[in-house]
C-alpha cells in the first residue's frame, strides 16, 4: 500500500477514535501510526477497560485499497492518574511501556501500566 492509501487508512482510524470518545476527551495523533487519547473524569478503571475493548473491536477491520485487502488492529497502553503520576511525560512513558508489553505479547490488546514505585512517583509529582 502506498503512502496516500496509508494516510487514508490513518484518517479513518482518527475518525473512529474521535467518534468513540466523549467530546471532553482529547484525541490526537502522535505521529506514524500512534494516537493518544486523554480521558478526564474517569469513574473507575472498569470504564477505561470497557472503552479499550470497544475501541479494539472497532479497529479490527479489513480495508480494500488498490485492489488489496489490508487488515488493521490496535494495541493500547493505558496509564492512569495518580498511579503513574500526574505529569504528561510520566503518564506517556508509563503508557508507552504498557503498549510495548501488549506488542510483545502479540498485539491486538490493551494493558494498564504498572503503578510507579514510590521513588518514581515522588519524581513525577
Please provide the spans of the model-predicted regions.
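Conserved long alpha-helical elements within nucleotide-processing catalytic cores of c-di-GMP signaling
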Residues: 1-22, 28-32, 36-37, 43-53, ...
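A short, conserved beta-strand element in the Rossmann-like catalytic core
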Residues: 4, 70-71
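Cyclic nucleotide signaling catalytic output domains
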Residues: 27, 54-58, 64, 68-69, ...
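A general secondary-structure signal for short beta-strands and their flanking turns/coil
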Residues: 32, 73-74
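Short hydrophobic/aromatic beta-strand micro-patches
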Residues: 38-41, 79-81
